[in-house]
Amino acid sequence: MLTVAMPKGRIFSEALALLKQAGYDIPDDLEHSRKLMIDVPSEQLRFILAKPMDVVTYVEHGVADVGIAGKDVLLEEERDVYEMLDLRISPCYLAVAGLPNTHVHPIAPRVATKYPNIASTYFREQGEQVEIIKLNGSVELAPLIGLAERIVDIVSTGRTLKENGLVELERIVDVTSRFIVNPVSYRMQDRAIERMVDRLTYAIEKVGENDEN
């Protein structure tokens, strides 16, 4: 039985739809279950539901053989996992945003973000020295209360930025969800994992063909 770590929330719904597209017999009530660990004996799968940032931890430490994680999490965490497949679901991107016509402090302006490693790397590559302030939620609030001049955050539709009077300043990197694998699990259960990769690849291509039509 393969243990699959899945992120709760929007990605979970899209991932389940992709698994069904790949031919997996997923119970219809799985998406609405309150359980955090769910077995699907007919497919020899066990699902662990976790916060997005925790999925890579479960896979890295081997309590999950495989998992689904956003590219943003993989870039931020830099964990020892194999990134096997771009699932092409939950597309979004990381961006720098702030209030329009904001005066940026000339010496180490402050940037609030849930992604301190990504933000630090980005501004360093831009040759800009900044002070990174790590937040765990409501990053958009930081410029409004004077905590930071800019933020680095995930943008999907841009609606949250607009509703809070913020504008996108720079686009950093595109993000989609990825299929990740524990290195030891890959050696021990390579056939089962490769079969899952093949089925998901087929589903991704099928979805792509439908989108083109």
Curated annotation (Swiss-Prot):
GO molecular function per UniProt: ATP binding; ATP phosphoribosyltransferase activity
Xref: Gene3D superfamilies: Periplasmic binding protein-like II
Subcellular location: Cytoplasm
A GO cellular component entry from the record: cytoplasm
GO biological process terms held by the UniProt record: L-histidine biosynthetic process
Alphabetically ordered keywords of this record: Amino-acid biosynthesis, ATP-binding, Cytoplasm, Glycosyltransferase, Histidine biosynthesis, Nucleotide-binding, Transferase
Pfam families assigned to the protein according to its UniProt record, in alphabetical order: HisG
Enzyme nomenclature, EC number: 2.4.2.17
Quaternary structure and partners: Heteromultimer composed of HisG and HisZ subunits.
Domain notes: Lacks the C-terminal regulatory region which is replaced by HisZ.
UniProt similarity note: Belongs to the ATP phosphoribosyltransferase family. Short subfamily.
The name this protein goes by in its record: ATP phosphoribosyltransferase
